[in-house]
Amino acid sequence: MKEMSRYLWPKDSWGDKLRVLLAVGLLVGGKVLNVQVPFFFREIVDSLNVDIAATGGTVATVAGTMIFAYGASRIGAVVSQELRNAVFSSVAQKAIRRVATRTFGHLLNLDLNFHLSKQTGGLTRAIDRGTKGISFLLTSMVFHIVPTALEISMVCGILTYQFGWEFAAVTALTMSAYTAFTIWTTAWRTKFRRQANAADNKASTVAVDSLINYEAVKYFNNEKYEIGRYDKALHQYEKSSIKVATSLAFLNSGQNIIFSSALTIMMWLGAKGIVAGSLSVGDLVLINQLVFQLSVPLNFLGSVYRELRQSLLDMETLFNLQKVNLSIKEKPNAASLVLPKGGEIRFDNVSFGYYPDRPILNNLSVTIPAGKKVAVVGPSGCGKSTLLRLLFRSYDPQSGRIFIDDQDIRDVSLDSLRRSIGVVPQDTPLFNDTVELNIRYGNLDASREKVLEAARRAHIHDKIESWPHGYQTKVGERGLMISGGEKQRLAVSRLILKDPPLLFFDEATSALDTHTEQALMSNINEVLKEKRRTSVFVAHRLRTIYDADVIIVLKEGRVVEMGSHRELMEGNGLYTELWMAQEMSMHDQSLGRSEREAPVPVK
């Protein structure tokens, strides 16, 4: 509630504050008019509870004014309520937008480790339910809880003043019993709702995971397995939902028994008053109307309290996401990264591991010279891609420091650091949108001509133009509607459009055929020579990086060799072993193809 008050009463928006005050004014006015309705009804009954034929007169003269006042009060109460809804709706929707935007922005700023450990389906579900919970909380507070409390207070005061302590005592006992029963039962039901929420998140996560990996499901004929996983999650949700529904029936029954008992007692007391001559028939009608008038807000209060507890649970999850600490933080007033040397990168005794018991880099020290093409090679798991994640500050090293042109990357702003680095990852992330938007994502302000030029330089323009919808072709979720090679060339196009001073290629051509790879690498090399960009190529296929100015060989998180291709081959070390193993593999594959293609001799 404290968190929500900042959004409901924003410091910087006098317009929203005025709307809240106007909504409160309409609320009070509407409830005052609503409470007047039973009084006018009593006057109408008492006015007509005489022998009109004997006394003379008409409906207009006997009860006309009261009937008009009765109708006007009902209309006024309804109009006030609807105006209140209309006035407050903009406040509620703005608050929801602010919370959702802030949470979404916070999630985008969290470190990579958080997103790798969380499942997307569960996060989106939590945000969706949380924003709905906020909407319900705001509307229930303004439209149900506060109006109900005001109406109950007014009715209790009227019953006490008009009819004495007995009616007041019954009313007070009813309110206490109703409220206590509702709170106790709802608290008991909360654990069932929590279980249902957890099962709902699990089912959503399983569904999203299976649909995203649709091809893998098909490749291994595991449809039944995935359906079984989903059904198992839904079965848990089913069991929890049955408990929720059963406990709700118990709650509703108890509330109705309490209220009906109170109404019966009050009607008995009213009837006794009529027999004793202290009350009129109109008074009995007034008591009945006032008590029934309480039934609607009380029923609302019961249902609102139930939903309010659920909404608070959902909001708790949402606000807890906002409270997740940023492990990667920039210093206050951090300076922007500048590159006076052109982008020299230096790792100084860097140690890092994704898990404490599994170190990846061990006191690694290496310098990547500015304006040079540098390759990083080595066996799988030696830490090649980890260098990029540390440089990009997706993670911070456990020890050691990383410098760019003698500036510790922890001392510069994250925005300037990440704007200076361009990446072509091995698994290209694409949005479910057009080809043009996915290329333009490298520079959202780029003109169409620059987008086309970037595509040409990445050797993908002609291919795109051959598609029926050209640059407006949708690539599908995660780019599933285009080939792996096309995805990689789109990623290169995006990088060329961004045009950063530091370039990282993580197996950027692994999905390309030899001819396309050679043409693309030729264009990339032209870009590097034109602007003397510092570039780092992570590669397994050594033939793609043999022309690098410097080749860094990693093993078990340390630099074991460093030099040009010729120098490393002369050194006869790990690089030579890797090169010879790949050459032998290519020779065997070529020999195998030749044997398969050789003509069978005719006997």
Curated annotation (Swiss-Prot):
Cystine residue pairs: none
The ABC transporter domain, residue ranges: 345-581
A biological-process GO annotation: intracellular iron ion homeostasis
Domain called ABC transmembrane type-1: residue spans: 20-310
UniProt topological domain (Mitochondrial matrix) ranges: 89-137, 184-249, 306-603
GO cellular component, one term: mitochondrial inner membrane
Bilayer topology term: Multi-pass membrane protein
PROSITE patterns recorded: ABC_TM1F, ABC_TRANSPORTER_1, ABC_TRANSPORTER_2
Enzyme Commission no: 7.-.-.-
Domain of life: Eukaryota
Gene3D superfamilies, alphabetized: ABC transporter type 1, transmembrane domain (1.20.1560.10), P-loop containing nucleotide triphosphate hydrolases (3.40.50.300)
Residue positions binding glutathione: 189-193, 252-255, 302
Transmembrane segments annotated in the record for this chain: 20-41, 65-88, 138-161, 163-183, 250-268, 284-305
Positions annotated to bind ATP: 354, 378-389
GO molecular function: ABC-type transporter activity; ATP binding; ATP hydrolysis activity
Broad class of the protein's primary localization: mitochondrion
Keywords linked to the UniProt accession: ATP-binding, Membrane, Mitochondrion, Mitochondrion inner membrane, Nucleotide-binding, Transit peptide, Translocase, Transmembrane, Transmembrane helix, Transport
Task of the protein: Performs an essential function in the generation of cytoplasmic iron-sulfur proteins by mediating the ATP-dependent export of Fe/S cluster precursors synthesized by NFS1 and other mitochondrial proteins. Hydrolyzes ATP. Binds glutathione and may function by transporting a glutathione-conjugated iron-sulfur compound.
Entry protein name: Iron-sulfur clusters transporter ATM1, mitochondrial
